[in-house]
Design a protein with these regions (language model features):
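Short glycine-aspartate micro-motif
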Residues: 7-11, 71-75, 181-185
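Short glycine-rich, Thr/Ser-proximal phosphate-binding strand/loop in the N-terminal lobe
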Residues: 8-49
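Phosphate/pyrophosphate-binding loops at sites that engage ATP/ADP/AMP, CoA/4′-phosphopantetheine
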Residues: 58-73, 171-174, 288-300
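Short beta-strand-loop/turn "lid" adjacent to the catalytic site in phosphate-handling enzymes
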Residues: 62-108, 126, 134-145
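Glycine-rich phosphate-binding loop plus the immediately following alpha-helix
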Residues: 110-117, 144, 149-181, 189, ...
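Adenine-nucleotide phosphate-binding core of ATP-dependent small-molecule kinases
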Residues: 242-296
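Glycine-rich phosphate-binding loops at beta-strand->alpha-helix junctions
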Residues: 299-318
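Conserved phosphate-binding/catalytic loops in two-lobed NTP-binding clefts
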Residues: 312, 316-342
Length: 358
């Protein structure tokens, strides 16, 4: 392993912010969130029109913090391309094309564009992404559903689930590739994956209406009722999609996606808030059980992660329901910046291969 200090810039674009981090090897020297006002974003017709502004604000932030623009690797949150295996990918023309013109448009698609534009300004600087949400290693039978013109897609919190798996494996003194794990990422969306020897062989689609409902997403809905709603004339296609992802789950039931507010309402005696949150927890527990079946019951551990794993109300009730399957371990938070930096550093040290996107 080289003793040279490796400098890494990490970029994680969100809908109203860009999270930025600078690492010197494993040590974070800057973690910053660049916020954008609604008025500032309203002038742009789409997320790609925001690219120059986001790039310039990032450079201004680095300068203001006294961080030299000198990096060995720039790694960004990956976009919604076609399905690919897990790993670290070099940003190339094919990735830039597919993120700009792909069917699924999301602000995460611009991350690789920012990374590529900045890396071009530096000699021998790598532009990378790692474990994007569309990582697909599902079993062939897991893709099928009851209509041949439709199929189950793999859209999940791959980056944090895999980083949490590696973290747990390191604590246990084993390799991620030697474990069978069920991992539940619980944030604005919820995905639960069955990880068999380093590959996620089954996971719910946390974006498009599959699995438990979450703070912002509806999860699996009764199909016939959904069809009737689509043809009722009350909502447009975009409005229906928003009711599935963005305005579903706790937002639809309780008017908020903030679980802290929901817990405060429960503490104050709000029976409806308790029922709805308990129903969400119940759905997550059922999905954990289903993923244990995908692993034929051979589960070494169940890992709870994401922002909601900070809430003892949620984790304690999940533990009650699923601890008969395997020991439950809690790793709160998303840690996406750290996970991206760890992937970049592993590449720079020659410990992880760089995959080619095609």
């Amino acid at each position: 392993m080289s003793l040279t200090l490796r400098k890494i810039l990490v970029i994680n674009p969100g809908s109203t912010s860009t999270k930025v981090a600078v690492y010197h090897d494993e040590r974070p020297v800057l973690i910053k969130t660049i916020h954008y006002s609604a008025d500032e974003l309203a002038q742009f017709p789409d997320c790609f029109a925001q690219l120059p502004t986001r790039r310039e604000r990032l450079l201004e932030t680095l300068a203001a913090e006294g961080i030299p623009f000198d990096f060995d690797a720039i790694i960004a949150r990956g976009g919604l391309t076609h399905p690919i295996p897990a790993g670290v990918y070099a940003v190339n023309d094919a990735m830039l094309r597919d993120t700009r013109h792909g069917e699924r448009q999301h602000v995460c698609n611009i991350g690789c564009h920012i990374a590529a534009a900045l890396a071009r300004q530096l000699p021998a600087c790598l532009a990378l992404v790692a474990d994007p949400e569309i990582v697909d290693e599902m079993l062939p039978e897991a893709h099928l559903c009851g209509r041949p013109e439709m199929g189950r897609a793999s859209v999940w919190h791959a980056l944090n689930q895999r980083a949490t798996a590696r973290r747990h494996a390191k604590i246990q003194g084993v390799r991620y590739e030697d474990l069978n794990l069920v991992i539940a990422h619980m944030g604005g969306g919820i995905t639960v994956g069955a990880h068999r020897h380093g590959k996620c062989i089954e996971v719910n689609n946390g974006l498009d209406g599959d699995g438990p409902f979450s703070p912002e997403r509806a999860g699996t809905l009764p199909a016939a009722d959904l069809v009737r709603a689509c043809f009722s004339g009350k909502w447009s296609e975009s409005e229906m999609l928003s009711r599935i992802a963005g305005q579903g789950g706790l937002v639809a039931w309780l008017g908020t996606s903030d679980v802290r507010e929901v817990l405060a309402r429960i503490e104050a005696g709000d029976a409806q808030a308790r029922l709805v949150l308990d129903a969400m927890i119940y759905g997550v527990a059922k999905t954990i059980g289903a993923q244990a079946v995908a692993l034929c019951g051979q589960v070494d551990a169940i890992l709870l992660t994401g922002g909601l794993a900070h809430a003892d109300y949620i984790t304690s009730r999940l533990r009650e329901r699923v601890s008969f399957i395997a020991p439950v371990h809690i790793y709160p938070g998303e840690n996406e910046l750290e996970a991206l930096a760890e992937n970049a550093l592993a590449v720079l040290h020659g410990e992880r291969e760089v995959c080619t996107y095609a």
